[in-house]
Amino acid sequence: MTKGIILFVGAAVLPAAVYAAGPDAQTGSRDYPVNPVPMSQVHLNDVFWKPRIDINSSVTVPSCFKKCEETRIPNFRRAAKLQDGGFQGDPFDDSDLYKVCEGAAYSLASKPDAALNKQLDALIVLFGKAQQPDGYLYTSRIIHGDKAPGRAGPVRWLNEMGGVTGDDSHELYNAGHMIEAAVAHYQATDNRAFLDIAVKLADLIQKTWGPGPEQLKISPGHQEIGLGGYRWHQALSSRRYRFGCWHIGGFWQCLRDAQQWLQ
């Protein structure tokens, strides 16, 4: 994460602290020690948190989206063939835009904002246009194909543990952050548009990794994909995505790390 986006992290934490189950979810979880409070049941009117959350909505989120306009959003436009030019930045920069979208979704949940909602809708449409037919979404490779520079590696997924270039590709890292953002958006708006894009990518990952002879057994370079899968399970009461954690030692550790991070 680059310095320009770091300021967003703290601002995203406050709305996320009231992280909660979605419209069709059960409250509580057998493997999570804290029962989350649904967003719709949280209303702040104090003199400490509410002003800060208001600043998050009016200043921090717009500032972060403006920062993402420098390279991150243009990369998605190029992947969608809506803008000319090559990829800029690092491949994991895709995740920064997902993180900002996640924080914006929490902001919407705490303070409805028609303009912000419209901005998110436009970005979600862009994500859908950039996404490959099979669900793959990693702008560096989509723009440059197998000639993607740097840590991307020569083919999909192969460089997840940095075996080719020495630096992991962050394909699964980006995907994990997309899933988290999509779940947050669904919780805040009851709109499945972003969730459906994430489902398409997650289905591809679930199909790609596993115990089968044609499936990959490469452990991820970061626990974020496990965290995304666990967030899906926690928020939507669905075990649809565990990403082969019970088959691959690295993924099982990834899931356990994700549980610790969430707690």
Show where each model-derived region lies.
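Positively charged n-region of N-terminal signal peptides that target proteins for export
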Residues: 1-4
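Glycan-recognition and catalytic cores of secretory/periplasmic carbohydrate-active enzymes
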Residues: 20-263
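Bacterial N-terminal signal peptides
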Residues: 6-17
